């Protein structure tokens, strides 16, 4: 989250990625919310009295702001665009997925802003639904799957319903489309590291049962 100011322009890049898609209904999922603050960072700013103060920036607030901008711009392009939350409140991963079913979304895009305690770590990355055994990705899964209830039963449901097999190819194509355009823009203009396109078993993507990606938009 340490490059969150750079990440705030991310929604403009996403707008470039979507105009050619045949999908007309898009569900934007601002990660975290309510008591789940997500990652956080701090910066110095001046208050209304001109005093320099240290302020904390939470991932939940940043991704909500970015998601609202995405929604506004895409609506101007005549897309049907919904948010899983429009205010700072807790929404379970199951509820987020049920919203996708309710609005009959063609695409599910979950917006996050990763973090690291290592100063040299950072960059942007795009995840699509698929199982894997990479330890680093497992750590990301643990963070982003915290809002789920009954993880074991969910994993069984994923395996039984074969959600991964049904959506992996379309989700991977979506991830490649978005990521390639992000890469061209961010690496050149903001010099943010490309951390690649990666598979991940994210419950919110699996439960939505449709093509989707989880975007870690820069840290």
Regions found by a protein language model. Name each.
Residues 121-122, 135, 157, 192, ...:
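Residue-level signal for pocket-adjacent positions within structured domains
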Residues 22-152, 165:
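Catalytic-core regions of hydrolytic enzymes
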Residues 151-155, 214:
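Flexible hinge/switch segments at interdomain interfaces of large molecular machines
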Residues 1-9:
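Bacterial N-terminal signal peptides that target proteins for export
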Residues 24-27, 38-41, 47, 113-117, ...:
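Active-site-adjacent mobile loop/cap segments within catalytic or ligand-binding domains
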Residues 12-20:
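Hydrophobic h-region of N-terminal signal peptides that target proteins for export
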Residues 156-165:
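Short glycine/proline- and acidic residue-enriched helix-loop micro-motifs
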